[in-house]
């Protein structure tokens, strides 16, 4: 630091005025550079801190924060709104300022130069926290660490302030931001304070919610308070009303409020700083107080944070003092320093004032003042960026599952197989293929296998289709690999306790799937025998992962990898890489292989891969190749820190994973020792591990001569070198699972990994059984001397205390790839003692079928019988919080294992179990909170909740602090039970009840309960109004306390009483009136609880007389234990004051309906909620019964509604049941019962009723004490879905000779005589011209030669389809024509064609000589400079126009100068992207397409005529492309702008969507329904050259739609643009439906051959062809031209059918139309439809019950299209496919058919 320099660093409380997203983006980019290591460290630490703090939030708040990998990701989120606004804004400001501060130093590459004597830190509000991080630092590295803790404090401060403030005034339910502070200028602090004092006095404002001064200086005063009260204060005071004032951007609550916060609040926020910053750490730099203008006196960190917290929460800001403090600093150093510098983050109004004052003070002195902006550096370019580092997290494998040969259908069976040394070798099962015909050991039979051996999984076709929402037909067509990938993924997640969304690492958007697969046997063989609707999604590899992501709603990446034999382990390595890269937080990975195709056997055998003698003989001298094997395996992987935070069971830790390639091998299939060794070194370096420390290696070990020799060499050289030698205690054990279960090919690597994980679990290396004779002589001879060898017997592998065992897993691919994983032991988890203080525990089981639920219950019962030591708390945690819950449910709350066993046996022994079990409703029932009154009070209510749950405790404490600040006593001793009896105090009694109820309501929300309505009984109505947002929590406490105090002061204790009577009001009146002694007794009805429960009140003696009289008539009466008669005349003395107090309380519209016992109705708005309402509620009858009846009448509640009694004891529960006997009511607390047990029982009831409680929050307080149990896996309700390979056609195809017959091209008429106006506008039928408007109607004939030629230049499905450029030319033609009529002197007309929407495609009829008219209607209005257009079809004979248009658009007449200005700003960006594409093409990273190739790709959907083919070359990179365009010189007609020119410059977007490999063009085609705008700066020129550029992207609002902007350039300038052109994805199955000529029916393909009788396999009908080759199929299309292309199109999920025909065999070889009359009477239409649905879906008719939903049956949008076509074709029943959405269940569908068909 310059010795002559004094320095002040100012940390403001406002963001810089720059684009914040850009600042954070630049900060992030710089953090990747090696130059900015400390900046990166700070951002990473801040990310960790924020994730840690967010994880501690209650889930409703946690859900508001999107998943983020870095705090900078949050810069794109609008963090200034919502409940987290204050926290996010505070923390992000702290991050920005400290990030800029650190980056400034590193950008300038200067050392820490802050000299304490010459450096002063200053700041305002949150800025002081950032400054504190610097004040405590002696180096820049310290700032990085301390800064993260400043971020933590900032976040906590924001959370705390927002929470407290929300209790003072309820935030707006619509998200509207209201300021909590206004600044007043030109008034003194004293005069403003006088006005505020007057307002607070006049309005009886409570101290807690008073309006106050939070900041002041000479020129301004800041006034703060709840927004409504601040507004009221300015309206109340004429002086303030007419003062100069502005609202400040303070939207989240109050700081600087000494009346609101105390030391306990400050401690709650700042005590976190001690977690990293030592409390005794010295303060290094002076930090100025914004209140006193003097440096804080603190000497240590803890004192400093305490002072800062006190100032932020309770201190007033005095800017003049800040300025004076800065001047004083400069004055003290003025003699030694001649330069004064103020560093800041941009400037602000406050900072400019400080600058001016300081410079003015030193104006006469010879000092140089410098201003330094700490933000400027971020905009600099520091040259090429050097990557900082790779991620260094360890990874944890937390779950696994398998289906492996030899019956190893779970991990226990797999281990048993290994432990017993079993060999799973068999011959090929008959369900795969017939060895009698396909096996020839001589090799003479073409396409036959020379080996009969393999290793196969049991029951590969068995699958629970219903669980995965698949129809039997879809399940049958789906590859067993895909099915078992789903199953094992679920089982692995079940073992891992993964519940998507439970923790940040398991958020669905952060979970990805990675599977290895190297064959397509099912698709190529079994399913190809009869290709059906689900052939593609059931057989294509990508759908294996896609199904997992789609079913579980994971939106992370899904990759299906093929690296031959190493695919499975390579998929795991890819998953690890994604985790290390931060792309995901959880990965599900595995390998898949199910063998069915004899072709692959033949191919591998002919290539000499396979052994002809049997199993893989790993390291045996007779090794002669590998033996094929099935295998399915899945693992779940997380980063280690996430797994530990999630309380997972860690099976092993991944230290490193690498893949390379044997590029130098002698042949592509030959292994290479050098490459293998290089891969080992890489993975060891990655982990920093000594190879000598590795003690177990699971070899690739295939049992081939070359493979075994090379791997043994590479392993021994690296892991057991000659020198340094391994010590005797460093034995390297080797194993090879292929000797047991064969070579699983794509699943081989995952099988090896599963074995290694089991070795870790079992602490034993199983025996190697691969050496059948003697060891292979090619293996190094000195292995024993090197202390390495195969484990020839089961060998213990104990874990040594203080050390971690290291293991390596190898998997090599036949193509040359090598993958290696390095593993170590899981961390030793020491669980905290679990004292099981909770006396009741929830145990939950669920399934998707009754059979599975029963089996799950039986397996749990069996587990408990075998493990009687099972900890009930762990079992509850596992089954409740760590399981996905399904619609068939069992649940119970028990206190011991025997009770659970009894409950399970009771259910299982019930013979009516199957009929009594019902699935939960598809829609969760509504929930009503019922708040009890004072009568439920007792000491210790909620004691256990207060002790156990920090969230509940914090809510009670915060509400209690509000009560104390309002002058009322603390209620905590009542709630936690530390005082025994305080019922004599009405204030304490009523406040404790209301505070308890508000806290309970918030606790229920934390537990995942979504509230539909509230109702309060008497005192409980205050809590209900607070929870509904009508009044704030602070106001509820204030009013209840005031009301109670008035009662104590104005009402006589014990003079009145209340009596509960078991009779109606009328019955009581009649009985009393009939008695001579009771007729004159006066009483009042206080409460009508039910129709037979009434509470009356009055004078004590008279109530006693009434009780005696009624009891004499056998009427049950109960005298209530209350000191006053509420809701009677005894309350009259308090009413006026109560209303006066309530008059100053703001009332809001309820956020949820309020059921009013006063008004006997439901309240939805604020009109009837006011001070008078509370007055009446205190005095008038509580008509609880009428309120419930009204809610029933209004449909707000019904018999399915769940009611939660919120209060100390369930009083309202009985009242609700009295009104709705069948209703479900649960309690929050119960007298003489543990409140946690009560909540637990209630949660179980809610769970069984169909709600989804947040079990994670229920177990969260003690989660670290619980263990995740390894319980029996889900029991599947399986059916065998297997398509057997029939015949010998894989052999026969070697002898088949195929011929082809070319299709005859369609001939076009090219004549185009025209005497009409233009080629597209043929006749004007109406024209109206007025002064400023014009209307025009035209008619055109699409069969006219010019028009027809334009259409035929753009053909789809061999049909001419009108391109959008046709409508563009027509619009421009009519637009210029009308505009010039109204503005004849205009020189040029520039038009913007906007809002183009084409609802129906226009397809040219193939009937020549006919008329195909269309009408164009246009209306131009000069007042808006726009013209509306509509296109209509018309009748060919009458010319009558259709009622609805098929297309609309608007032409806007605009100034092209604005276009030029807009495009000038964009031109360099577009050119940059074009240059980047060109460079990528040069590098081979993008595809350069010639004109022929580009239009050949286009023919995938569209065939363009030559005139339309203007693109000379294209560079295509996924969804981004550019094209060089030359327009044809001929206009070919009369146009405004020829359509073929428009298409040439714009149809690049269509090529991207229909030709890019980024689009699924095999299953779909893409059509454009329109665009937002189309502009051309100048008219297109014949023969001119242009360039087009586009980047398409998926639209968030519609997953089936893409959009993008097409830029048209001439030279370097943009001369045109198609804005937001949209393309909709449409299944190719529907090509005929949407693009067929209006008058034709086409039959494609020959008739199918005659087939033999159908065979049936497990209920699925199969066609058996008479010849062994697959049969061709027939497609019949009968579609009209006008087919919807826009949002009304029911686009199916990605599935494609080769034919819409059923797989059911037909007796006739030709297609015949449906008969005119059904074979059955019309009354049987429903049964016919049901049978057809059963046939097409593969379900039994009995399964189509009335309550079965189409989603559950697997009827998706594609199947609904197929069914609607079948209904029409076979039954003559016209049903739209959308009806399956409108009638979502079988019952609704059949009712519709009965009604309308």
UniProtKB/Swiss-Prot annotation:
Bias (Polar residues): 1663-1686
GO MF annotation list: 3-oxoacyl-[acyl-carrier-protein] synthase activity; fatty acid synthase activity; phosphopantetheine binding
Cofactor(s) named in the record: pantetheine 4'-phosphate
E.C. designation(s): 2.3.1.-
SMART domains with a match to the protein in the record: PKS_AT, PKS_KS, PKS_PP
Occurrences of domain Ketosynthase family 3 (KS3) (ranges): 392-825
PROSITE patterns: CARRIER (PS50075), KS3_1 (PS00606), KS3_2 (PS52004), PKS_MFAS_DH (PS52019)
Region described as Malonyl-CoA:ACP transacylase (MAT) domain: spans on this chain: 931-1251
Gene Ontology biological process terms from the UniProt entry: fatty acid biosynthetic process; secondary metabolite biosynthetic process
Keywords: Acyltransferase, Multifunctional enzyme, Phosphopantetheine, Phosphoprotein, Transferase
Positions of region (N-terminal hotdog fold): 1322-1458
InterPro entries: Ac_transferase_dom_sf, ACP-like_sf, Acyl_transferase_dom, Acyl_Trfase/lysoPLipase, Ketoacyl_synth_AS, Ketoacyl_synth_C, Ketoacyl_synth_N, PKS_Beta-ketoAc_synthase_dom
Chain positions covered by the region annotation Disordered: 1663-1723
Active-site annotation: 565 (for beta-ketoacyl synthase activity), 700 (for beta-ketoacyl synthase activity), 743 (for beta-ketoacyl synthase activity), 1354 (proton acceptor), 1543 (proton donor)
Pfam family, one: Acyl_transf_1
Entry note about domains: Multidomain protein; including a starter unit:ACP transacylase (SAT) that selects the starter unit; a ketosynthase (KS) that catalyzes repeated decarboxylative condensation to elongate the polyketide backbone; a malonyl-CoA:ACP transacylase (MAT) that selects and transfers the extender unit malonyl-CoA; a product template (PT) domain that controls the immediate cyclization regioselectivity of the reactive polyketide backbone; and an acyl-carrier protein (ACP) that serves as the tether of the growing and completed polyketide via its phosphopantetheinyl arm.
Name of protein: Non-reducing polyketide synthase nscA
């Amino acid at each position: 630091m310059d010795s002559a320099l004094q320095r002040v660093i100012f940390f403001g409380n406002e963001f810089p005025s720059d684009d914040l997203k850009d600042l954070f983006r630049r900060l992030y980019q710089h953090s990747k550079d090696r130059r900015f290591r400390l900046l990166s460290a700070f951002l990473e630490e801040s990310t960790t801190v924020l994730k840690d703090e967010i994880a501690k939030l209650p889930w409703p708040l946690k859900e508001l924060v999107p998943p983020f990998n870095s705090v900078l990701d949050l810069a794109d989120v609008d963090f200034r709104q919502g409940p987290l606004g204050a926290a996010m804004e505070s923390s992000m400001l702290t991050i920005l300022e400290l990030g800029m501060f650190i980056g400034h130093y590193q950008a300038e590459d200067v050392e820490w130069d802050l000299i304490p004597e010459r450096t002063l830190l200053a700041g305002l509000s949150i800025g002081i926290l950032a400054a504190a991080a610097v004040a405590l630092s002696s180096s820049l590295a310290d700032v990085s660490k301390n800064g993260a803790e400043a971020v933590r404090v900032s976040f906590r401060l924001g959370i705390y302030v927002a929470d407290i403030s929300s209790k003072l005034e309820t935030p707006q339910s619509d998200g509207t931001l209201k300021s909590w502070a206004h600044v007043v200028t030109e008034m003194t602090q004293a005069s403003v304070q006088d006005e505020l004092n007057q307002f607070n006095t006049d309005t009886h404002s409570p101290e807690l919610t008073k309006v106050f001064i939070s900041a002041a200086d000479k020129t301004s005063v800041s006034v703060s308070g709840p927004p409504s009260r601040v507004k009221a204060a300015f309206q109340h005071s004429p002086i303030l009303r007419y003062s100069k004032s502005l609202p400040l951007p303070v939207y989240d609550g109050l700081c600087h409020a000494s009346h609101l916060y105390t030391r306990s609040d400050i401690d709650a926020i700042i005590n976190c700083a001690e977690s990293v910053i030592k409390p005794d750490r010295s303060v290094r730099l002076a930090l100025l107080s914004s209140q006193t203008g003097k440096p804080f006196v603190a000497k240590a960190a803890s004192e400093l944070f305490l002072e800062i917290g006190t100032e932020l929460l309770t201190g007033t800001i005095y800017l003049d003092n800040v300025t004076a403090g800065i001047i004083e600093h400069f004055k003290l150093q003025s003699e030694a320093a001649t330069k004064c510098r103020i560093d800041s983050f941009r400037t602000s109004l406050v900072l400019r004032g400080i600058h001016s004052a300081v410079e003015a003070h030193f104006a006469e002195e010879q000092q140089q003042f410098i201003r330094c902006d700490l933000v400027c550096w971020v905009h600099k370019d520091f040259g090429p960026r050097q990557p900082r580092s790779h991620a260094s997290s360890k990874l944890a494998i937390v779950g696994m599952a398998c289906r492996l040969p030899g019956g190893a259908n779970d991990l226990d069976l797999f281990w048993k197989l290994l432990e017993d040394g079993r060999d799973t070798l068999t011959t090929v099962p008959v369900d795969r293929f017939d060895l009698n015909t396909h096996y020839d050991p001589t090799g003479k039979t073409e396409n036959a296998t020379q080996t009969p051996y393999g290793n196969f999984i049991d029951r590969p076709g068995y699958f629970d289709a219903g669980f995965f929402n698949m129809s039997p037909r879809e399940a049958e067509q789906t590859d067993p690999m895909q099915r078992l990938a789903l199953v094992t993924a679920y089982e692995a997640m079940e073992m891992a306790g993964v519940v998507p969304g439970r923790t940040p690492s398991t958020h669905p958007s952060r979970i990805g799937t990675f599977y290895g697969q190297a064959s397509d046997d099912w698709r190529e063989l079994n399913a190809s025998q009869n290709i059906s609707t689900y052939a593609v999604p059931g057989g294509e590899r990508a759908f294996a992962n896609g199904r997992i992501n789609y079913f579980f709603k994971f939106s992370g990446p899904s990759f299906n990898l093929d690296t031959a034999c190493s695919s499975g382990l390579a998929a795991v390595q890819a998953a690890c890489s994604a985790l290390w890269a931060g792309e995901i937080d959880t990965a599900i990975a595995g390998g898949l292989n199910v063998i069915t195709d004899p072709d692959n056997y033949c191919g591998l055998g002919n290539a000499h891969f396979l052994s002809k003698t049997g199993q893989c003989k790993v390291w045996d001298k007779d090794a002669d190749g590998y033996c094929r094997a099935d295998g399915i395996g899945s693992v779940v992987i997380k980063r280690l820190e996430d797994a530990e935070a999630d309380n997972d069971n860690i099976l092993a830790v991944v230290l490193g994973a690498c893949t390379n390639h044997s590029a130098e091998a002698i042949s592509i299939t030959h292994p290479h020792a050098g490459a293998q060794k290089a891969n080992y070194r890489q993975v060891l370096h990655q982990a920093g591990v000594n190879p000598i420390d590795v003690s177990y290696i699971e070899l690739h070990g295939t049992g081939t001569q070359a493979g075994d020799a090379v791997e043994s060499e590479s392993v021994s050289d690296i892991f057991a070198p000659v020198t340094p030698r391994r010590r005797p205690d460093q034995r390297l054990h080797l194993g090879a699972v292929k000797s047991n279960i064969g070579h699983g090919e794509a699943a081989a690597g995952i099988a090896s990994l599963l074995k290694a994980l089991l070795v870790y679990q079992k602490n034993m290396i199983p025996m190697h059984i691969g050496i059948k004779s003697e060891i292979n002589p090619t293996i190094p001879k000195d292995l024993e001397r090197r202390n390495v060898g195969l484990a020839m017997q089961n060998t213990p592998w104990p874990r040594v205390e203080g050390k971690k065992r290291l293991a390596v897993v190898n998997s090599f691919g036949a193509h040359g790839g090598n993958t290696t994983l390095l593993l170590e032991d899981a961390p030793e988890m020491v669980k905290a003692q679990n004292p099981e203080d909770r006396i009741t525990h929830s145990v939950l089981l669920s399934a998707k079928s009754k059979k599975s639920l029963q089996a799950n219950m039986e397996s749990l019962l069996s587990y408990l019988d075998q493990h009687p030591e099972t900890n009930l708390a762990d079992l509850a945690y596992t089954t409740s919080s760590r399981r996905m819950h399904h619609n068939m449910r069992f649940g119970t709350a028990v206190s011991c294992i025997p009770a659970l066993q009894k409950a399970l046996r009771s259910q299982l022994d019930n013979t009516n179990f199957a009929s009594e079990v019902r699935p939960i409703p598809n829609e969760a029932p509504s929930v009503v909170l019922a708040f009890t009154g004072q009568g439920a009070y007792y000491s210790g209510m909620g004691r256990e909740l207060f002790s156990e749950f920090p969230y509940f405790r914090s809510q009670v404490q915060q509400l209690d602090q509000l009560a104390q600040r309002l002058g009322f006593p603390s209620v905590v001793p009542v709630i936690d039970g530390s005082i025994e009896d305080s019922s004599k105090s009405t204030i304490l009694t009523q406040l404790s009840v209301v505070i308890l109820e508000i806290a309970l309501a918030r606790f229920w929300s934390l537990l995942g309960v979504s509230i539909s309505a509230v109702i309060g009984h008497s005192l409980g109505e205050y809590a209900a109004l607070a929870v509904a947002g009508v009044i704030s929590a602070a106001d509820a406490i204030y009013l209840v306390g005031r009301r109670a105090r008035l009662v104590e002061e104005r009402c006589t204790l014990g003079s009145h009483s209340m009596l509960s009577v078991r009779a109606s009001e009328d019955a009581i009146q009649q009985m009393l009136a009939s008695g001579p002694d009771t007729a004159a007794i006066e009483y009042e009805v206080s409460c009508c609880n039910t129709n037979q429960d009434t509470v009356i009140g009055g004078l004590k003696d008279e109530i006693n007389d009434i009780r005696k009289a009624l009891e004499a008539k056998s009427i049950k009466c109960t005298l209530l234990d209350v000191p006053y008669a509420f809701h009677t005349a005894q309350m009259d003395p308090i009413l006026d004051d109560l209303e006066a107090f309530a008059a100053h309380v703001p009332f809001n519209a309820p956020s949820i309906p309020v059921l009013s016992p006063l008004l006997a109705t439901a309240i939805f708005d604020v009109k009837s909620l006011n001070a008078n309402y509370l007055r009446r509620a205190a005095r008038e009858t509580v008509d609880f019964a009428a309120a419930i009846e009204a809610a029933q009448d209004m449909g707000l509640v019904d018999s399915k509604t769940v009611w939660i009694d919120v209060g100390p004891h369930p009083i309202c529960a009985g009242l609700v049941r009295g009104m709705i006997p069948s209703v479900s009511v649960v309690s929050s607390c119960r007298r003489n019962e543990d409140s946690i047990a009560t909540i637990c029982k209630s949660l179980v009831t809610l769970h069984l009723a169909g709600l989804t409680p947040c079990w994670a929050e229920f177990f969260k307080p003690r989660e670290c004490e619980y263990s995740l149990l390894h319980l029996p896996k889900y029991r599947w309700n399986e059916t065998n879905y297997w398509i057997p390979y029939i015949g010998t056609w894989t052999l026969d195809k070697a002898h088949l000779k195929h011929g082809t017959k070319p299709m005859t091209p369609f001939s076009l008429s090219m004549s185009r005589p025209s005497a009409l106006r233009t080629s597209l506008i043929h006749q004007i039928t109406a024209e109206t011209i007025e002064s400023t408007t014009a209307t025009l109607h035209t008619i055109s004939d699409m069969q006219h030669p010019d028009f027809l030629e334009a259409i035929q230049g753009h053909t789809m499905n061999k049909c001419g389809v009108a391109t959008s450029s046709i409508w563009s030319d027509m619009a421009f033609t009519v637009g210029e024509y009308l505009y010039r009529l109204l503005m004849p002197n205009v020189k040029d007309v520039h038009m913007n064609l906007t809002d183009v929407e084409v609802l129906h495609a226009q397809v040219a009829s193939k009937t020549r000589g006919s008329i195909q008219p269309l009408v164009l209607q246009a209306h131009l209005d000069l007042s808006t400079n726009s013209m509306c257009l509509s296109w209509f079809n018309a009748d060919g004979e009458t010319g009558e126009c259709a009622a609805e248009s098929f297309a609309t658009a608007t032409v806007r007449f605009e100034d092209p100068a604005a276009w030029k200005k807009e495009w000038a700003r964009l031109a360099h960006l577009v050119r940059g992207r074009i240059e980047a594409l060109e460079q990528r093409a040069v590098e081979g990273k993008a595809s350069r397409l010639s004109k022929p190739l580009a239009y050949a790709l286009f023919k995938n959907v569209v065939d363009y005529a030559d005139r339309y083919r203007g693109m000379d070359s294209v560079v295509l990179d996924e969804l981004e492309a550019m094209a060089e365009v030359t327009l044809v010189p001929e206009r070919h007609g009369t146009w405004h702008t020829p359509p073929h020119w428009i298409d040439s410059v714009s149809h690049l977007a269509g090529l991207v969507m229909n030709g890019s490999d980024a689009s699924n063009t095999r299953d779909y085609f893409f059509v454009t329904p329109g665009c937002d705008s189309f502009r051309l700066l100048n008219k297109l020129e014949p023969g001119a050259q242009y360039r087009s550029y586009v980047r398409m992207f998926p639209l968030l609002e519609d997953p089936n739609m893409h959009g993008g902007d097409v830029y048209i350039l001439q030279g370097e300038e943009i001369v045109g643009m198609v804005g937001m052109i949209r393309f909709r994805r449409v299944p190719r199955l529907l090509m005929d439906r949407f693009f067929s000529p209006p008058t034709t029916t086409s039959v494609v393909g020959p008739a199918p051959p005659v087939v033999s009788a159908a065979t049936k396999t497990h209920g699925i009908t199969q066609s058996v062809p008479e010849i062994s080759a697959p049969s061709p199929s027939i497609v019949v299309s009968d579609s009209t031209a006008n087919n919807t292309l826009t949002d009304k199109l029911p686009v199916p999920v990605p599935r494609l059918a080769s034919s819409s025909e059923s797989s059911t065999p037909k007796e006739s070889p030709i297609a015949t139309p449906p008969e005119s009359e059904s074979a059955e009477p019309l009354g049987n239409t429903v049964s016919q439809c049901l049978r057809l649905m059963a046939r097409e879906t593969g379900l039994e008719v009995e399964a189509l019950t009335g309550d079965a939903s189409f989603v559950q049956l697997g009827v998706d949008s594609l199947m609904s299209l197929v069914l609607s076509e079948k209904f029409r074709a076979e039954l003559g029943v016209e049903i739209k496919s959308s009806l399956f959405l409108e009638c979502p269940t079988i019952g609704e569908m059949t009712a519709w058919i009965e009604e309308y068909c």
